[in-house]
Amino acid sequence: MEEMASRMISGDPELGEPFQENGLRPKYLKEFVGQKPLKANLTVFLHAAKQRAEAIDHILLHGPPGLGKTTMAQIIAWEMGVGLRSTSGPVIDKAGDLAALLTNLNPGDVLFVDEIHRLSPAVEEILYPAMEDFQLDLMIGEGPSARSVKIDLPRFTLVGATTRAGMLTSPLRDRFGILARMQFYEPDELQQIVTRSASIMGIDISADGAFEIARRSRGTPRIANRLLRRVRDFAQVAGPGYIDKDLADRALLALEVDRNGLDNMDHRLLKALLDKFAGGPVGLDTLAAAIGEERSTIEDVIEPYLILQGMLDRTPRGRKATHASYTAMGRTAPRPVQQGTLL
């Protein structure tokens, strides 16, 4: 879907965006904005591991895309003063690929595996003893001459990241000593992130301009930084050269991001739900066909934020509009029909 690829408020990274993000990532936990419960716990775990001169336990970071899982993995390595090796689940095709990564780690190093839920079963089998016993069990040769070889590994920390924790197998999930869910950010936290990013990028921005971008960023720092870069373009070419609330509002409306943080895809879904199905309930497949999108696109991309904002209900009979749905679309919600009594 071409529209999906260019969606301004998707939490997934765009082509080349990770390189732009690198300069904006904080290095230390104290610089990381938001995720206060996770930061508090990690501070304890990191200090305890350093006091014992041990590698910190394996960590699973899970949550929607764009919330800072990769950044957190880098911070963990930086705080521990160790090296970081990064890869992703789909890249590790064979057990040998994983073995090569593990045998090249130094004591205490962090191995970061993004999209860890996409590891193949064969690779997972190799990972189990590596995580638990810090050993590799490899088969050398084939047929009758094949033999098992155990290779000792340095104590390392595996940091896995996933947007779908439910797709992890139980044996893999159970081997993580620290499970951490990353939550969506509050607008004031995103305002701090936008202000910090603007300072690094040399952008002149007012407090209300930063908040205007923050409150439309769907609780996601990656989206906030992306919108900041695009609003900067409007300020540079069609504005006064700095970002205030008025310019941010005009630029974001031009980018089809409304004052609720909804874009064209969100509007299409809500419009179909209200106009074609009278607010629902309607089955997911029927709704997907009505807006020309795949079922998975609605479930994974469009729905989560609408549900978070109370603009969509999942019911046993299908998707249903809420009072907030009508308000967001500038409609008046119908009054609930009251059933009469028999008496």
Swiss-Prot record:
Chemical reaction(s) catalysed: ATP + H2O = ADP + phosphate + H(+)
Keywords for this protein: ATP-binding, Cytoplasm, DNA damage, DNA recombination, DNA repair, DNA-binding, Hydrolase, Nucleotide-binding
Region of interest (Disordered), ranges: 1-20
GO molecular function: ATP binding; ATP hydrolysis activity; four-way junction DNA binding; four-way junction helicase activity
Any one GO CC term of the record: Holliday junction resolvase complex
Region (Head domain (RuvB-H)): 259-343
Region of interest (Large ATPase domain (RuvB-L)), residue spans: 1-185
Location of this chain's protein in the cell: Cytoplasm
Enzyme Commission designation: 3.6.4.-
Function: The RuvA-RuvB-RuvC complex processes Holliday junction (HJ) DNA during genetic recombination and DNA repair, while the RuvA-RuvB complex plays an important role in the rescue of blocked DNA replication forks via replication fork reversal (RFR). RuvA specifically binds to HJ cruciform DNA, conferring on it an open structure. The RuvB hexamer acts as an ATP-dependent pump, pulling dsDNA into and through the RuvAB complex. RuvB forms 2 homohexamers on either side of HJ DNA bound by 1 or 2 RuvA tetramers; 4 subunits per hexamer contact DNA at a time.
Protein family per UniProt: Belongs to the RuvB family.
Name of the protein described by the UniProt record: Holliday junction branch migration complex subunit RuvB
